[in-house]
Amino acid sequence: QDKGDYWWELRACDYYDEFEKPKIIYPNILKRPEFTFDIKGWYTNQKCFIISIDDKYLLGFLNSKLNHYLFEKYLPKLRGGFYEPSYVFFKNFPIKKIDFMKKSEKLAHDEIIKHVDLLLQLNEELKDTKLPAKAEQIKQRIAHSEEKINQLVYQLYELTPEEIKLVEESVNG
């Protein structure tokens, strides 16, 4: 039986076990891509969505400037410049599938994962850092890894310098 005897006894979630697995978590309303990776089995409420997949390459793409640009093209804009990346709109995003037979794509994929792992580590360090100078140093390393991921994503999507400029101006402007 999946519901209780009284109205306040809500039925159990059919996908509880998905919360225990590695997954990508993101808020249901956001201004820019804010995706994180969970390996600790965090549970979320209705204010967040989860993507039940252990895929740090996808996490790197989702937080990239190119994905931010795609937000502007595919997602409806809410008041205040916010977006609601629900599945209905998100399912049409052109996420690059890696051809592992192509050495350049495999290398870019592996580099993205390396930088995502570094970013996850650096963000943990930043949370624990009390010294302003150390925090600034970590922030610079974070910015460097984010930029490396952006360049790798541009490479995978074979963007021209003009297209890269368009993306950069759109999300930085």
What does each model-identified segment do?
Residues I95-G173:
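Non-catalytic DNA-recognition/assembly elements of restriction-modification systems
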Residues Q1-S104:
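Polybasic, glycine- and aromatic-enriched phosphate-binding surface used to engage nucleic acids
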